[in-house]
């Protein structure tokens, strides 16, 4: 089975890829996983039937066009398409529904699932405390234990304070420089992450959707005329 992952950035890509591979392995399904990171989240275009702007590079800006292309090439084949991103300051339920609606419209012949981490992908990493501690044995366990799972609290900043000695300096620097560190944390922590042990509600929503799709990758959408 083929799994294609569209992610908003490189740090999210490695986490989702490794977790998807481990979930599939636990379910006894052999998969080939391809990951396609983008430059940020962006927003769904007002005219989703139009070609994207020439220099568009964010996930949602390109999503309708990419869904059309995937449906043309892979429609009806043994494939799962994962759309993975952070909810940031959006309402997770509303954003998830918008993405599923877009997928049903432009890729009705492909089984698509949404991996939406609450606020940021670091919520999924913080959902596996053992993985954080294994990756960074000298981490601040007091800060780790005080984190309220999947709360909107500046999640990457929490992880930064858990694992970095110069956290406040890094937080002050912020974007775009922090992107390098976020990718490093994701690469390191995801090596140790175990799907069955993760307590993040948003991760477990994704996990159950993927398990369901692995058992029956038939598209759940009926063709409709828009």
Question: Where do the protein language model's features map onto the residues?
Answer:
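Helix N-cap/beta->alpha junction signal
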Residues: 8-9
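Conserved SAM-binding loop
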Residues: 5
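C-terminal accessory helical subdomains adjacent to catalytic cores in phosphodiester-
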Residues: 2, 13-226
